[in-house]
Swiss-Prot record:
Similarity comment: Belongs to the ABC transporter superfamily. Glutathione importer (TC 3.A.1.5.11) family.
Protein name: Glutathione import ATP-binding protein GsiA
Gene Ontology cellular component terms for the protein in this record: plasma membrane
EC nos: 7.4.2.10
Subunit structure: The complex is composed of two ATP-binding proteins (GsiA), two transmembrane proteins (GsiC and GsiD) and a solute-binding protein (GsiB).
GO molecular function: ATP binding; ATP hydrolysis activity
Predominant location category: membrane
Role noted for this protein: Part of the ABC transporter complex GsiABCD involved in glutathione import. Responsible for energy coupling to the transport system.
Amino acid sequence: MPHSDELDAGDVLAVENLNIAFMQEQHKIAAVRNLSFSLQRGETLAIVGESGSGKSVTALALMRLLEQAGGLVQCDKMLLQRRSREVIELSEQSAAQMRHVRGADMAMIFQEPMTSLNPVFTVGEQIAESIRLHQNASREEAMVEAKRMLDQVRIPEAQTILSRYPHQLSGGMRQRVMIAMALSCRPAVLIADEPTTALDVTIQAQILQLIKVLQKEMSMGVIFITHDMGVVAEIADRVLVMYQGEAVETGSVEQIFHAPQHPYTRALLAAVPQLGAMKGLDYPRRFPLISLEHPAKQEPPIEQKTVVDGEPVLRVRNLVSRFPLRSGLLNRVTREVHAVEKVSFDLWPGETLSLVGESGSGKSTTGRALLRLVESQGGEIIFNGQRIDTLSPGKLQALRRDIQFIFQDPYASLDPRQTIGDSILEPLRVHGLLPGKEAAARVAWLLERVGLLPEHAWRYPHEFSGGQRQRICIARALALNPKVIIADEAVSALDVSIRGQIINLLLDLQRDFGIAYLFISHDMAVVERISHRVAVMYLGQIVEIGPRRAVFENPQHPYTRKLLAAVPVAEPSRQRPQRVLLSDDLPSNIHLRGEEVAAVSLQCVGPGHYVAQPQSEYAFMRR
C-alpha cells in the first residue's frame, strides 16, 4: 500500500506515537511512551539520554528486532522512504520483507562490534554476504565491493584485512568494519547505537569524522544514539532528549545547547565534563552537578588541596612488563608484547596521578603490575619505604590491605551469588579485622558513605544499576582503609551524570581519608577534573608527566597534543578543523624475543614537568 502522501517532503523516516513495553512477571513495563519524530535525508538526529531512557529499544523497534525479544510495539505511523523512493509502513512488513529492508534501506551499527561480528567468518565473507543478499552479486563481485567499502572507511591494507577474523583487529578497526558492512548497500537511513562509547578519544574522532564524510557522500539520514553530549555537539543537526521513556525536549543542536528548556536537559548538560573548564586552576574540583529536585541549587566549588608533602607513598622505578607470544610447530616463544617499558613515577599521599593514553599504551598493565596481578620482568615498586615487587605471596596479601583496585566493569568484579553485603565483608573476613557485629556495622557505614542505604546489603548485584554497582565496588575497596586506590577506567562505561557523581564521591573520600589515587583513563575531560598530576603513556612508556595544569594548558609532546585535540567539545558552534585522522592507528609494540627497545629520555621543561624528546615528529603522530 503506497504511503507517499503521508510523508512530508524531504523526510526519509517518520514515527508517530511509538509505544514499547515488555512483560515482566505478568506485568506490562512501559519502556517508551508516545514518542514521535521525523528524519530528513542527509540530516543527523541525535537521540540522547541516560541508560534506561529508551534510546536503544527505539532503534530496535525501527529495525523490527524487538518482537523476537518479547517486546510489545504499538505505533500509529512508522514510515520509511526506501532507496527506490517507495514509502513503506514498517509495521506492516512481513518478516521476509523486513529482511530485504534491513541492510538495503535501513542499517544499524551496534555499540560492541566484537559481539556483532561473527567470530568464525573472515571480515571479507561477512561484508560480502550482505552485498550478495541485497544486490544479487556473485561471490567475486561481492568481494571486490567489500574491498572498496573497506577502502571507503579508510582501513589501511584493505586486501589483507579481508582475510582476517574479527579477533585479529583492534576495537577501532572492528568498528570501521561494522560501518563498512552497514553502508555496503548504501542505505537511506543509518542508525548508530553508541558506536563510539567504548573507544579511545582518537579512534572516536576518526569514527565520527568518517560517519560525517560518508553521510555527505551518500545523502543518508543518520540517527545517532548516545549519552555523550560532546559527541552530540560534534555530529548532530537536531537533538531529541529522552528521559524515562519519553521525549522531554527536541530542537536544533544550537537550541538544546544554548537555551535548554527542560530541567533534565539542563542537568544533562551540567554533568558534561568540559575540556578547558579547569583552565587557570591548580587543584581538582568537584563537578557542579544540578539536581532535578533543586535545579537552582548550586554547590560551592571546593579546591582539592589534599597532597601531603614529604615521602611518596608509592615509588615506581624502571617497571617492565612483557607478555610472551608463541608460534611455530613447537609452540615456542618467538615474540613479546612490550606492554610496559621502563616506567617510573612517584605517588604522594592525598594525590591523584592519572595515567592516560589509548588502548595498548600500557596504562592498565602498569596498574595491574603494581599489585602483581600481571608479572613484571624488571624494575622496583616501593610502598611506604618497603620494596614489594619481590615479596612472597603471603606477605603480599597483607600488603593488599593498603593498596586496593577498582575495576572498569563493576558487574564482572562482583560475585552474582553473593549479596553485596557479603562482597563488602569479604576483605574484612580475609584479613580477620573485625568480629561479626562490628563488621556488619562497618558495611552499613560504608554503604552510607558511598550514597547507598544500609538495607541494600541484602540485595544482589543484578538488582542495582551500573552506577550503583560501581559505588558498591568503591565501598569494598574502602573496607580496609587503604592508602592507595588504583582505579582502572572506573567511570568510562557510566552515564555522564553518574560519572560526575562517582568522581565527586572519589574526591570527597580523598579529602576525608587522604587516599592516593592512581586514576587510569582515556577520558581527558574527566582526567582534567580529578587530577593533581598527569602521566601520558605511549607504547608502554611515559612520554610526558607533570602537574595537570601544565600538561593540559601547555602540552609539549605531539602525542599529548593529539589526545587533547581528539576530545569532543560540547559546544556546537566550535567546529573542530578537519584532520587526516582516518587511518591513524598505533604502531605495534610486539618485538622479537630478546629485542630491546630504546627507553625514552625525559627532559625537564618546567617545575615538575618532564617530556620525552621524540626522534622524529612522525614517530608519534602521523599528520
